[in-house]
Amino acid sequence: MPGADYSAVKGGGLKLKAGKKNLFKVGKEKKKKNKDDKEKIDPDTVENGGWRKIADEFDMKGGTNVAIEVASGAGSTRTYVAAMDNGKFTIGFPHPEGEGPNPEEIFALVKTPDDSKISLKTGFGRYVGVDSEYQLVAMAEAIGSREQFVLVFQEGKTAFQAVSSPLFLSTVPNKEGHIYVASRTATENEMVNIRTDAIQEGPVDWRSVEDRKNARECETAYVKMYQHSKVDLKNRHIAIDVKDKKGVKKAQADGSAHELLLDRRMKMKSDRYC
């Protein structure tokens, strides 16, 4: 309007009638709240000096430190499997609340992402294994079948099983104080807690670069990979089934993309010469 007095207009930022809070701050507050939730400490971890319990195989990372705690129906016992300087093992003394395992109760975990078998190395530089009398020992300087184990996770409980025999570690020492891997079934005396001081990370996608692509690009990559090197790799030489990409997507998720794509490739070749 001509002649209006614009100097009387109060300056400032845009004010929204929806509420007093700035809408742009809502996301930040939510993000901060989620961050605080992630940083919450598990009381069980605090009681064990920062050593958290491993609940499944996917949390087992090679190169980390682990300890084998004697499990109990009442919860944490803070009692661990301990290596002795004579190569044998015993059950250590209970730790006070808030204290982690001793150095002789800590093992270096050896594991590859694509294998469920694990190996453990003591602070004395020897690998944990089972001798001919089924005694838990650490004598070997290299890993063999006797130095390999699997962890059985079921219904929130964990058992320690040898690969060389279908026997489980018992946490009940003999008269000499040594422990054995000689139990045929996993009962209360065979229950353990595997603990680590490593920071828990999110799930890791171990699939290859090709498997992580979308269905069409994934199949194209594998056709190129398995074609003869002398074949020109222009699009006219690459036979791709443009139908049924749902099967490829499912195989990518299941980890069976290699087999499915090779089967599809063979079928396309056979159809061509029919």
Curated annotation (Swiss-Prot):
**What keywords appear on the UniProt entry?**
Actin-binding, Cytoplasm, Myogenesis, Nucleus, Ribosome biogenesis, RNA-binding, rRNA processing
Q: Which organism is it from?
A: Caenorhabditis elegans
What does the UniProt record say this protein does? Answer: Binds to mRNA in a sequence-independent manner. May play a role in regulation of pre-mRNA splicing or in the assembly of rRNA into ribosomal subunits. May be involved in mRNA transport. May be involved in epigenetic regulation of muscle differentiation through regulation of activity of the histone-lysine N-methyltransferase KMT5B.
Per the record, the similarity remark reads: Belongs to the FRG1 family.
Q: Basic and acidic residues compositional bias: what residue ranges?
A: 34-43
Give the location of motif Nuclear localization signal in residue numbers: 20-36
Record-annotated membrane-spanning stretches: none
Cite the SUPFAM superfamilies for this sequence.
Actin-crosslinking proteins (SSF50405)
Listed name of the protein? Protein FRG1 homolog
